From Swiss-Prot:
A lipid is attached at residue 2 (N-myristoyl glycine). Residues 122-132 have a biased composition (Low complexity). Residues 97-207, 417-459 are annotated as: Disordered. Gene3D superfamilies: Gamma-retroviral matrix domain, Human Immunodeficiency Virus Type 1 Capsid Protein. This protein is synthesized as a Gag-Fms polyprotein. A motif (PPXY motif) lies at residues 157-160. This is Gag polyprotein. It comes from Feline sarcoma virus (strain McDonough). GO terms for cellular component: host cell plasma membrane; membrane; viral nucleocapsid. Residues 100-121, 133-146, 156-169 have a biased composition (Pro residues). InterPro entries: G_retro_matrix, G_retro_matrix_sf, Gag_p12, Gag_P30, Retrov_capsid_N, Retroviral_Gag-Pol_poly, Retrovr_matrix. A motif (PTAP/PSAP motif) lies at residues 118-121.
Length: 459
């Protein structure tokens, strides 16, 4: 190999076509430049144990996943496809990845605490009591009576890969801890099992189904704004759920019912059905094709078959397209014009609010270069009066970009007087007036005194 050091990130670049194919099979897209940035910089700087070189243990991958899927503004929805693809490579490695996997394998002794379990019952009469802790299966999931597919959980919980030893030992209560609210992953055996997917490989290599829990839906609704208030944020959340959880048709309906209003659901479904592709790849208007690809009633799709999974993949893609289509609002520039800079608000904060208004009340993207002129005019004329007046007097204003105007506005803002400075200036001005008035009064008095003296002399 000479001086070349091969690391897992560099190895993925050497087999980039296979990495992209792996991502595409999961219905997601990844780009090489961002892949490099995340693997070698951003995930390292999260300080959760992601190494600059070498293969991260799966528990560290889970730590990165927690950061990415964190609710609200602390999450990174744009990184979901990349960590999902990395997780897939680590848990189901191709041949060119396996030589780099020995470091994660030492954690596999984690199932060893399970091995004393079968050998212990013959040695003590206390162990026959343990089976009584196995039958209580409610801890597998929080109660979720609304799911019509909950009866599928009567099968074994998702097995630990490799089908270790006696299956009953894998059913111990600690191993069946509740699914985490965002990833629904098991933390007891992170080195082998944490997939964060409801469709997992179960007994006899059959996919096993895990529905959303009530706590999942509650947390997603609680920690994210309504669709009517911020459609982009909620669309990003649902996209990350669709990518990582690979939900079934029933899951998708449950998700929409929990996160959207009835009117919003109707708009989303209508927009999604408009995007159903025909034989030529363009949106079709044939009702039978639309109903087959995006049915409004529960279809007979078996997620255990390749055909069923392909139907679900297309359905999820169309649902995401419907969310994006429903997020586009009719233009309401009057609402945009109501966003004006506050008296003490910084130009950067005002510009951020202005861009958010464009996203919320118009179908335009304020980051689009084609919309730069409109955003610039709004920024100038809706700034505070002192900043607006000085920006309007700039020479060559037509050649300024939005970044240039923001810098100029920051300069003007930073040169503003503080309340103390303004008070000092007004006090000095008043003092100068008083001095001037005093001098004038002195002159008048001096003139009067002089005139009186002259009269006295004449008399």
């Amino acid at each position: 190999m000479g001086q070349t050091v091969t690391t897992p990130p560099s190895l993925t670049l050497d087999h980039w076509s296979e990495v992209r194919t792996r991502a595409h099979n999961q219905g997601i897209e990844v780009r090489k430049k961002k892949w490099i940035t995340l693997c070698e910089a951003e995930w390292v700087m999260m300080n959760v144990g992601w190494p600059r070189e070498g293969t991260p243990p799966l528990d560290n991958t889970s730590q990165v996943e927690k950061r990415i899927f964190a609710p609200g503004p602390h999450g990174h929805p744009d990184q979901v496809p990349y960590i999902t693809t990395w997780r897939s490579l680590a848990t189901d490695p191709p041949s060119w990845v396996r030589p780099f996997l020995p470091p994660p394998k030492p954690p596999t002794p984690l199932p060893q605490p399970l091995s004393p379990q079968p050998s212990a019952p013959p040695t003590s009469s206390l162990y026959p009591v343990l089976p009584k802790t196995n039958p209580p299966k409610p801890p597998v999931l929080p109660p979720d009576p609304s799911s019509p597919l909950i009866d599928l959980l009567t099968e074994e919980p998702p097995p630990y890969p490799g089908g270790h030893g006696p299956p009953p030992s894998g059913l111990r209560t600690p191993a069946a801890s509740p699914i985490a609210s965002r990833l629904r992953e098991r933390r007891e055996n992170p080195a082998e099992e944490s997939q964060a997917l409801p469709l997992r490989e179960g007994p006899n290599n059959r996919p096993q189904y895990w529905p959303f829990s009530a706590s999942d839906l509650y947390n997603w609704k609680l920690h994210n704004p309504p669709f009517s208030q911020d459609p982009v944020a909620l669309t990003n959340l649902i996209e990350s759920i669709l990518v990582t959880h690979q939900p079934t048709w029933d899951d998708c309906q449950q998700l929409l019912q929990a996160l959207l209003t009835a009117e919003e659901r109707q708009r989303v479904l209508l927009e999604a059905r408009k995007q159903v592709p025909g034989e030529d790849g363009r949106p079709t208007q044939l009702p039978n094709v639309i109903d087959e690809a995006f049915p409004l009633t529960r279809p007979n799709w078996d997620f255990a078959t390749p055909a069923g999974r392909e139907h679900l993949r297309l359905y999820r893609q169309l649902l995401l397209a419907g969310l994006r289509g429903a997020a586009r609002r009719p233009t309401n520039l009057a609402q945009v014009k109501q966003v004006v800079q506050g008296k003490e608000e910084t130009p950067a904060s005002f510009l951020e609010r202005l861009k958010e208004a464009y996203r919320m009340y118009t179908p335009y993207d304020p980051e689009d270069p084609g919309q730069a002129a409109s955003v610039i005019l709004s920024f100038i004329y809706q700034s505070s009066p002192d900043i607006r007046n000085k920006l309007q007097r700039l020479e060559g204003l037509q050649g300024f970009t939005l970044s240039d105007l923001l810098k100029e506005a920051e300069k003007i803002y930073n040169k503003r007087e503080t309340p103390e400075e303004r008070e000092e200036r007004l006090w000095q001005r008043q003092e100068e007036r008083d001095k001037k008035r005093h001098k004038e009064m002195t002159k008048v008095l001096a003139t009067v005194v002089t005139q009186n003296r002259n009269k006295d002399r004449e008399e």
